[in-house]
């Protein structure tokens, strides 16, 4: 029987933290921590005979993710608004640092053919297109009221965000930006944490969409990981590389910002590279 693993709360916390940042994927962090395949299989198996082991694995992950989103939403609102460039450089370092790990576990030198490299290019192109689709969040935080049309919009946004969250390289929060609801959702989270429940209907609409997206997309991803593993990994590598385009905030504007941005970029790269090596050694 699958046992409750307390360490998975920390892994879920790391995934939830990354999903607060537009352009950074919780799926990428799951890969880096060596739990991606089991995470997808558990979500896919939650409505099957594998319910209990799937449920037991997912509970600490979900607890960690909720803790991260509840405790860090205000911090990331501050960092992204006041220190945007250094923050995004740090996550850019994390993303680049995972690429060697992905190449190693896919054994690309001997396994990849022309079609696999074409899938890598396709993944990069898809992320660039998604990034260019971003229409911002111009009305974020202006209101927490809902209409029937907005309920449908938040549900669809949540569904697409959770589907994206499961794919390394595609950020769930970035998909919320594409739909123009990221800022409002972040405001709703921060208000609910303060026990102001005016934003709760928004979170429920998004939450039900997230649940639907998880159920549907996990089964699709699980199928491709099982039956077309190399092609899927090639696409994932493309997504991860392409996500650099999504997180690039522009160049620093002064020497101090250049220094800070480069330092945190290197820190992010080293952290990601080290975790990737540890995960690869333990597989």
Regions found by a protein language model. Give the residues of each.
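Generic N-terminal helix/loop capping motif
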Residues: 16, 20, 24, 32, ...
């Amino acid at each position: 029987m699958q046992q409750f693993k307390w360490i998975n709360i920390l892994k879920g916390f790391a995934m939830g933290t990354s999903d607060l940042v537009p352009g950074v994927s919780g799926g990428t962090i799951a890969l880096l921590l060596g739990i991606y395949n089991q995470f997808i299989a558990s979500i896919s198996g939650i409505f099957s005979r594998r319910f209990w082991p799937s449920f037991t694995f997912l509970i600490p992950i979900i607890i960690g993710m909720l803790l991260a989103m509840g405790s860090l939403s205000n911090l990331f609102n501050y960092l992204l608004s006041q220190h945007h460039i250094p923050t995004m450089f740090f996550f850019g370092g994390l993303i680049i640092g995972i690429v060697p790990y992905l190449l190693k576990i896919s054994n690309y030198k001997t396994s990849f053919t022309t079609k696999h490299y074409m899938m890598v290019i396709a993944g990069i192109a898809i992320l660039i297109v998604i990034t260019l689709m971003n229409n911002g969040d111009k009305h974020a935080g202006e209101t927490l009221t809902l209409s029937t049309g907005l309920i449908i919009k938040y549900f669809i946004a949540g569904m697409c965000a959770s589907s994206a969250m499961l794919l390394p390289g595609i950020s769930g929060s970035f998909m919320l930006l594409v739909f123009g609801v990221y800022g409002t959702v972040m405001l709703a989270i921060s208000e609910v944490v303060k026990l102001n429940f005016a934003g709760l209907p928004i979170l429920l609409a998004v939450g039900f969409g997230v649940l639907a997206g998880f159920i549907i997309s996990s089964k699709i991803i699980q199928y491709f990981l099982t039956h077309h593993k190399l092609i899927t990994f090639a696409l994932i590598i493309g997504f991860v590389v392409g996500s650099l385009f999504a997180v690039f905030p522009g160049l620093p504007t002064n020497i101090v910002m250049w220094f800070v941005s480069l330092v945190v970029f290197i820190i992010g790269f080293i952290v990601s590279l080290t975790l990737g090596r540890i995960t690869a050694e333990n597989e």
